[in-house]
Amino acid sequence: MRRRARAVAVLVTAFVLAAFAPALDTGGDAGLSVRAGAQAAAPRSATLVIEARGSTYVPATVTVGGGGTLTVVNLDTYDHTVTSTAVDERGEPLFDVRVAAGTTATVTGVEALANGRYDYHCRFHPFMRGVLVVEDSTGEVGADPVAFEQPLVVPRVVRGADVRLVMRQAKVRMLPRGPRTTMWTYGGSYPGPTIVGRAGRESRVTFVHRLPRKAGALTTHLHGDHHAASEDGQPTTHLIRRGRSRTYRYPLTYGGDPEPASFFFYHDHRMDRTARNNWRGLQGMFIVEDAASRRLRLPKGRRDLPLMISERSFTRRNQLTDPFAQGPTMQGHHGTMAFTGPGSPPDDHTVGSHVVVNGRYAPFHRVSATRYRLRLLNAAPFSAYNLSLSDGRPFVQIGTGNGLLRTPVVRTQLNLGPAQRADVIVDFSGESGQDVVLQSVPDADERGTGSRAAPVMQFRVGAPARDRSRLPARLPSPDLVTAPAEVSKTWTFDIGGDERHGTFWAINGKPFDPGRSDHRTRLGSVERWRLRNTSDMTHYVHIHAQQWRTVSRNGTRPPPWERGLEDTWRLDPGEYVDVAARFADHTGPFMIHCHMLDHEDHGMMARFDVVR
């Protein structure tokens, strides 16, 4: 990822030394740093530096005097932001500036801040964090605590063998005040209805395309499910044209047996437009129930909550911003594509200012002081959420998105990247009359891109209630395939191209070409694959259509929460994960790709074929 030319950094370093000489000290091996200064009074203005190969702000704590300005110098080859963690009454950061690689910028809004300490971070690399101290200020702008003003909406549930959803534009309540937000929806809501299917019984879902003309042709992928290639939401074929419909057939079986109880989600998967179409609202949840899970005395009914966590940014009129309007320019065509201009790899990050749950910003939900089942889904286009509860109580994880674990795992934090899911039990007993906040906190492991810090939603705990649920010591987990000793295929995730001709996200050195098969495997065979990240950024790798076992992570046994079935894995820089599956039932082309959706759209996808 650091293959970009270093000339920009060298030139900007020279510029900084000339233009910011009073504020910078270049002595020693520590790189550029802000001079402490001999004055007792706080400086009126200050400079913040992001160094080449930047992973920190220098200095980590910077002080600005009343009415002063904060200048940011980015010597790195990545774009970065300086974004306030605290927000105003609309949920917007108190300050937020993007600083392109090899440039400088002034952080607007600092001069109006009241005295105090303000945490900030990089939206694109959340492990980068710092503190701004404002002194001697006459400003009155300060942080507003998140109010949790609107109730959580649980999407309506649709059951039955035949489901019909109209993809149409609709106005959706996302923010607590002001106009509703216009979105592209499945069935008029965001998220779309939660589809519930019975394992072993075919579910037929018809999608009718009535979205505006600019939506173009669409395709729907049932993420995590096992089905035929024609039903997989192919990125360039089997498309749904405007005014037309298509029925997808999901048998909900694997190898002739019913699929295990699962928590999938459905979303648009159109080539080059996946990030845009998901951002506009084409997402929904899908639950598979089986006989074994129904016999368990897990929380059910109103105490079984599917929660889709994502993020969006809004205009002053509560409409979605369009982060794709000024996107990069594609050079060439699929198979040889590269991208130039702003937002080209590795600076392609669709990050929202507001975290939303089931489509609403900062919702609250009233619960009794009993056990609840939370089905947690990260449907964000880029960000990871490291989830915890504000009072320190644990999650008891009973499953992944693809089935139950063999034994429950007690966790105080759940790090979910894009497309990852966790099935957990939370016991709210002992908290009557209290509020418990589900929050995302910085990840202590800073090897990768990191997780954003933000309140997610609030649980308002009421009185105790009768609770018949139980937490089994052992769960009916699906059988795992026996993994071969040898690796059949290695998939390497990195960046390709150069600054002059354009860059692209690559798998095994190549951008995606829908007409090229990068691996062929026999129907009925069992293969062990290695997923390897040689870039400087975390990726979340998703493999379509099979039931995958995590064999090892960096050569060692995976952690307990990765010992069930999976379809999406976190890969930090330098990591590798071995996975294995039996290629059952269906032949044809399937996809492997990064589920950071801009990465997928900008080349980090490959095709493999199952053949007879």
Question: Model-predicted segments: where are they?
Answer:
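N-terminal, post-signal-peptide metal-ligating segments of extracellular/periplasmic oxidoreductases
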Residues: 34-76, 134-239, 245-247, 335-374, ...
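Secretory targeting and sorting signals
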Residues: 2-25
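Extended terminal and domain-junction accessory segments
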Residues: 135-168, 276-321, 400, 404-538, ...
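Non-cytosolic beta-sheet module surface loops
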Residues: 73-76, 124, 197, 207-211, ...
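Short, hydrophobic/aromatic beta-strand segments
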Residues: 80-84, 176, 214-222, 280, ...
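Extracellular/periplasmic metallocenter environments
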Residues: 31-37, 41-44, 48-52, 99-142, ...
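Active/binding-pocket-proximal capping segment
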Residues: 391-403, 534-564, 597-600, 609-612
